[in-house]
Amino acid sequence: MFFKNLFPFSIMGGICRKVVLSPTSLFIPTNGDTITADGQEVLFAYPNNCLFVKDLTKVVRNKTIIQEKKYDENHYIIYYDNKELFLPKQIWEPVKSAVNAFIEKGYLDGGILLYGAPGMGKSELAKLISKWLGIGMIQKRADDIMSKYLGESEQNMARLFKEEIPQNLPTIVFMDEVDWLGVRRRFGSTTADTASTTVGQILTVFLQLFQDEVIEKRLPVLFIATTNARLEDLDDAFKRRFPFKIYFTPPSQEMIEYFTDKYIKKTGKDTFVVHGKQLSKKQFVNFIVGTGISIAEFKTLLETQSFDSISSSSTYLRRVIPADIPEKVFDATRVKLNGYISFNCDDFNGRTKFHVASFPWISWAILGSYIMLQCKKPIFELLPTDNLSVEELVSGLKQYEPTFFLMFSSSRDDYRLAILASRLKRERGIDVVFFSEDNKLFPESVMLTPYYDISNISFVNEEEKKQLIDTVIHFYGVEAKPDELNILISSRIKGGNSTSDFLNSLQTYILAKSKITDTEKVKDVVKLY
């Protein structure tokens, strides 16, 4: 054939070695067609913008149909192979951009790094991309590379780039749970130093081969790596090889509601018994979100209906989510109560460390609602064990995005919390807010952390009280009866508008209705001495 004589000198980019067609496409290329991966009729062509020659080109009709459905403003549902993946917009849209860039150019200048909370679908998303593109996947974990024999680990890494990748082009290289390779080495013992040195050598080989054999040669290889580690804990050179960094957040309330609704539709059960207590759907969703459970764990619990295994204190990190705070009810001006909340969202960007004194449960709701709704940041509560060390605490935070909010509820006069807050701020850059029952602080606490006192707020009319009550009861998911609200709103107005009396009434009401007890307050966070 005439086109055989063009190979491999065609100025069009060469003869197509592989063309992947859409499963819904009626398009059949003819000899001499210039093939581009436009994401519609042709999912992928290698090399891009190549000439199709039937005798020389491998044609693959992809069997997987990918369908995208927008669930709401912030979430998508991706359907494929009788499966579905529920993803936040901030995950799915960057992934689409990266994959479409790979389709358009036929290569990427680096890889995709999926990092963040475990059990949220990082591995499943990598497999979805493989099915979407219709190309194979080379999967590598630590056991596939690491060896106890001297030099063999480096050889295994070299074999990936020199043999496996060239023999399987185009392909996806999926490096699952890459913490063993990408996390910065920390030295401390002879054994640890030796292991760190070995991994460091393997990392050097990986970085060099990735640059020389893939990026510079512009090979049709899509590298995807996943990790539960924090971004700041990864090696800088490793991160540079993965310019597409996509963060997986802990599950949102919308995610939990979606899978709960599916369960209700499947079983016909719209109430849930947890630890002997019957919960409505709303109560159940709020409870689940508060535990910080992963989507993978939650789906397993729904399948097995083993709700008694759920515990809000199963981990000392617990995400705090408002039950239902509509934007129309709660807005930025609502929490600016006579100077108590005088800061804005910019104050929560790496500079926060302070103490909130007096009426902790009300303060918690005000500040927590403000941060979540206005600043769009998650909040975490610390539920520590008796012997929790700072090192154990920090290791527990690694799966989350750095610089988020830890909210402590302290016992009276315990300034060790202030010291811990200072250490976390200084050593880890974590924003810290903690609460205590009153404003009687040790001098050390005052020096370490500025504090705010909610008892200084002056309520002069029923409307201000109503706004505050709404904020607090919505935050804790309390379903207040109208007569109870009327009593709270009118409380102490005839007695001279005593702020303390009103706040005491509200706090007592919240403690009773939300079943919060003094024993659940954090008392001993860490032994610092």
From Swiss-Prot:
Query: Which branch of life, at top level?
Result: Viruses
* Membrane topology label: Single-pass membrane protein
Q: Which InterPro entries match?
A: AAA+_ATPase, ATPase_AAA_core, MT-severing_AAA_ATPase, P-loop_NTPase
Listed GO MF terms: ATP binding; ATP hydrolysis activity
Primary localization class, coarse: host cell
Q: Which Pfam family, any one of them, does this sequence belong to?
A: AAA
Q: Name its cellular compartments.
A: Host membrane
Q: Spell out the disulfide connections.
A: none
- Give a GO cellular-component term: membrane
SUPFAM superfamilies for this protein: P-loop containing nucleoside triphosphate hydrolases (SSF52540)
PANTHER family, per database record: AAA DOMAIN-CONTAINING, VACUOLAR PROTEIN SORTING-ASSOCIATED PROTEIN 4A
Query: By what name is this protein known?
Result: Uncharacterized protein ORF529
Q: Tell me which species this is from.
A: Acidianus two-tailed virus
